[in-house]
């Protein structure tokens, strides 16, 4: 039965652990991967998440792993690689690879843990608990600049509410209705959408390989 209210003690511990993996480790490792290897490599490694989900959803969630699903995972990762390569600037090294794969594995936890938690709690309850705990875990890694102009604070609020909280609510609502391995494949449209927004807002352009990857 779905419980939209407060979490029990045992479940609260599980939610806190997920917060540290899915929020703290995810955002920290992605930032460190970008710093070590550049945005392009970081996002190629981030989107190894479909492979983690497809392989682990089989023993953990009982989802079928067949050739078609493995092929779709390979095609999705190849597409992300082509879109990212169009941006250039990859710097391959041990730290970049380690942090990038850590971001992919921690991102996969959203889907694997999500399928369990959505049987017990509404998405609103999940993220009301998970996001503050995960953000607190990131606090030691953040350098705060107290003197920000009002528009900067406005954009921080927009990013927090629209791009984070509401986005997570939307995709957990979708995750409830489909397999984890299928949902994570759909989510690989994110770098394509980012490339289109970059073209519209900042004048960045994809080359032929980038458009091939988007397709």
Feature names for model-found ranges:
Residues 16, 56, 65-86, 131-138, ...:
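Hydrophobic transmembrane alpha-helices of multi-pass small-molecule transport proteins
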Residues 1, 53-55, 59, 73, ...:
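Transmembrane alpha-helical segments that form core, pore/gating elements
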Residues 19-24, 28, 50-55, 81, ...:
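Hydrophobic/small/kink-forming positions within alpha-helical transmembrane segments
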Residues 23, 41-48, 113-135, 164-200:
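Helix-helix packing/entry segments at the starts of transmembrane helices
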Residues 25-35, 81-90, 134-148, 192-210:
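Hydrophobic alpha-helical transmembrane segments in multi-pass integral membrane proteins
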Residues 33, 45, 59-65, 117, ...:
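Hydrophobic/aromatic residues within transmembrane alpha-helices
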Residues 7-13, 70, 85-106, 143-158, ...:
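Juxtamembrane helix-entry segments on the extracytoplasmic side of multipass membrane proteins
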Residues 2-40, 46, 75, 82, ...:
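Specific transmembrane alpha-helical segments of multi-pass solute transporters/efflux pumps
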